[in-house]
Amino acid sequence: MSAYGLQRLYIGGDYVDATSGVTFDTFDPATGELLATVQQASEADIERAVQSAREGQRAWAAMTAMQRSRILRRAVDLLRERNDELAELEMRDTGKPIAETRAVDIVTGADVIEYYAGLATAIEGQQIPLRAESFVYTRREPLGVTAGIGAWNYPIQIACWKSAPALAAGNAMIFKPSEVTPLSASKLAEIYLEAGVPAGVFNVVQGDGRVGAMLSAHPGIAKISFTGGVETGKKVMSMAGGSSLKEVTMELGGKSPLVVFEDADLDRAADIAVTANFFSAGQVCTNGTRVFVHQSVQPAFEARVIERVKRIRVGKPSDPSTNFGPLASAAQLDKVLGFIESGKREGARLVAGGARIVEGDYARGQYVQPTVFSDCRDDMKIVREEIFGPVMSILSFVDEDDVIERANDTIYGLAAGVVTENLARAHRAIHRLEAGICWINTWGESPAEMPVGGYKQSGVGRENGITTLEHYTRIKSVQVELGKYQPVF
């Protein structure tokens, strides 16, 4: 008997059975136990979701912006009231420590909805004078039906991040969570409905990449917001363009550089590096996995990193003292272990971790040791490719120009950071680093006000911040002539 039973689709304000006849199972990453059996959506189910979203969106867009704002604020209140309940569900689904899901996942999702609830009434056009008796005005209008495709590392947070600007602008959204962590998105749908969002405005369809492809190719969907891997993102963009030239926003992978200069506070630098690699067991898109350390301070920096890695508390996710849990799936565990073996084969020096954790009950879960390699080379697989697990690669440098060039030598451009006491150098380096999200003397915070997205193959467009509303509206220009019309013929 599974803990959460049979999971159905959420369409039109209620749970409905999928018509595909296909199901898949989802498991607790910490124990291997069956969590739920999930129904997979069919093409007919997607059609039903689109039609439901169209109907709901008309009612939602007909409300005033202030009405939509109040409803979204009520959803925020409900999320915060149910934080602990949702955090436990997220813990079981992702394997994250309960201390983390209580403090981060729902909290940051609610913050973003609150932020866009406040901006709903600020969506406005312009008035452009042409001459004494003629002017143009513009309107920002909703796109209609949009779709969000989530990743497995932050299920409910991503659902909030994608739906908040969409709904604030008057759109509907059909959301597909990852099949690896499918449980919490439907709870958000329940909360939206309870808060007063019309039925159909936020639908949840379950399934694997085939369902994502149906959404991407559907001509009735005006926009796709996708979070995931680069190769899948390229497929989504191709299908979106090929079907209806729909707009896409994508937050994709990263192999982000963290540069520690010789004047850095090494205790601070080590704290930042360990957080930037081992928070959420390393399953964060923006992780600073390429740690470039000035040659003169590398030994002292390594010693501090090792000291902090020893303090990491691996344990059961339900234990409030645990701050490092399992990876989200068996497939991800195998992938990470493969990268670790690659690092060993290619000659990187292993200074911490390097193996699966198999003692006692840990053998039932997807646990891997926090792993640190040093003396890495730029051509190593662990340095070039996104691992998405708890593996830090330390590389040395001696010259600022050289390290910037090496840091930028990647297909990715999601995040970057520097640690230095010299603020002039900090800004100079950051301005040269090719990344969409940058940190100076810190790492990882992504407040609602901060646009998030990447350069190069790390993404298209932005999430969060005021600019994101532009991705969920379209501009209509209207000319008004007050004077006599001058005929051409």
From Swiss-Prot:
Residues noted as binding K(+) 1 in the record, renumbered to the chain: T26, D93, V180
Site feature (Seems to be a necessary countercharge to the potassium cations) residues: E247
Alphabetical keyword list: Metal-binding, NAD, NADP, Oxidation, Oxidoreductase, Potassium
Any one of the GO BP annotations: glycine betaine biosynthetic process from choline
Cofactor(s) required for function per UniProt: K(+)
Cofactor annotation remark: Binds 2 potassium ions per subunit.
Enzyme type, top EC level: oxidoreductase
EC number: 1.2.1.8
PROSITE patterns given in the database record: ALDEHYDE_DEHYDR_CYS, ALDEHYDE_DEHYDR_GLU
Subunit structure: Dimer of dimers.
Function of the molecule: Involved in the biosynthesis of the osmoprotectant glycine betaine. Catalyzes the irreversible oxidation of betaine aldehyde to the corresponding acid.
Family: Belongs to the aldehyde dehydrogenase family.
Full protein name: Betaine aldehyde dehydrogenase
Gene name for this UniProt entry: betB
